[in-house]
Amino acid sequence: MNRFENKVVVITGAASGIGEATTRRIVSEGGKVVIADHSEKRAEQLANELMHAGADVRHVYFSATELQSCKELIDFSMNEYQRIDVLINNVGG
């Protein structure tokens, strides 16, 4: 089933744990994912792995405790995909 086909999904805390599992599931269902995480290294590694497998993903640094980071996440997502269809807040602050 491709419930997320051509949907742009922004996931915070996306590079490990539940966020990573959610990222993988949405990609497997055709979603385009912005991997937003405070660990740039893990986010980049996951994005590279998924892109190598053919997924349409991007990664960006994100910290829920920094207002500027929140603004930059939205700007980044809009610049890359021109829209956000789904936002999954998977991080605490």
Language-model regions, residue ranges each:
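Conserved glycine-rich Rossmann-like NAD(P)H-binding loop of the short-chain dehydrogenase/reductase
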Residues: 29-46
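Conserved glycine-rich cofactor-binding loop
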Residues: 8, 15-16
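NAD(P)H-binding Rossmann-fold N-terminus in SDR/SDR-like oxidoreductases
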Residues: 17, 21
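Flexible cofactor-recognition loop at the NAD(P)H-binding site
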Residues: 16, 86-93
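Flexible N-terminal pre-Rossmann segment of NAD(P)-dependent oxidoreductases
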Residues: 1-10
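A glycine-rich helix->loop->beta "capping" turn
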Residues: 5, 53-56, 76-89
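The beta1-alpha1 cofactor-binding region of Rossmann-like NAD(H)/NADP(H)-dependent oxidoreductases
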Residues: 40-41, 60-73
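Aromatic pocket-lining residues of Rossmann-like dinucleotide-binding sites
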Residues: 26
